Regions:
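Sec-dependent bacterial lipoprotein signal peptides
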Residues: 1-24
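Mature, structured domains of secreted/extracytosolic soluble proteins
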Residues: 8, 24-213
Length: 213
């Protein structure tokens, strides 16, 4: 009887451990309404099919003559990563700057805002090095991670970090963070690993501002 009870306890412990592991790793993104996954289409067409999140970005791309970028017909090819600002971010920028519509944003600004988010290599969530945020008030750059030069020439320190789950460190979802040495602001990816035929998209969360990079 004692042996049987011990076996039951072991089976229960294994079940709980499996359940916890599944709960921790099922999602690596916030619920921003963007589904991560693989899409058999160009990044440009993917944006076009989700007007709720991306139609403002498409207007910016047209103004900046960057449609070929998202179609895979530019110097960046079909193997790049894009940290994309959603409509919420762009609408907030318009309101803050007293602009009525996206086409009122200066062309050069549209180009800079987009290229600030373009990384010239294909990088999924697991490709970003683990890191920890800075605890030094004199610098926004923490430990680990990696410094990248974006297509605009702007530098960003990017790292991944596994969040706690039920107050247990290192057991929750893995998130991507981006830190600008220029603005000292930290940004966060809301939905990651959106793969298209012309690159991978990591959607920035709704709190991101276009000037954060």
């Amino acid at each position: 009887m004692q042996h049987q009870m011990k076996k039951i306890r072991l089976l229960f412990a294994a079940f709980v451990a499996t359940l916890l592991a599944t709960s921790c790793t099922q999602y690596n993104f916030e619920d921003t309404g963007l589904a991560n996954g693989k899409h058999e289409k160009s990044m440009w067409d993917y944006f076009g099919e989700d007007s709720y999140n991306w139609d403002s970005l498409r207007v910016m791309a047209k103004r900046a003559d960057l449609i070929p970028l998202f179609q895979g017909n530019s110097a960046y090819g079909k193997d790049f990563t894009f940290f994309g600002p959603t409509n919420h971010t762009i609408r907030r920028y318009l309101k803050k700057n007293s602009l009525e519509k996206v086409s009122d944003i200066p062309i050069n600004d549209c180009k800079t805002f987009i290229l600030n988010g373009v990384l010239r290599k294909h990088m999924m969530l697991d490709d970003f090095k683990r890191g920890t945020k800075s605890t030094d008030v004199s610098t926004p750059i923490g430990k680990g991670g990696e410094m990248f030069t974006m297509a605009s020439g702007r530098q960003l320190w990017i790292y991944s970090f596994q969040e706690p789950y039920n107050n247990v460190p290192g057991t929750g979802p893995v998130q991507i963070y981006l830190v600008s040495p220029t603005t000292t602001r930290t940004s966060h990816v809301g939905s990651c690993n959106i793969e298209t035929q012309t690159g991978v998209v990591h959607a920035l969360d709704y709190y991101f501002n276009l000037n954060d990079f």
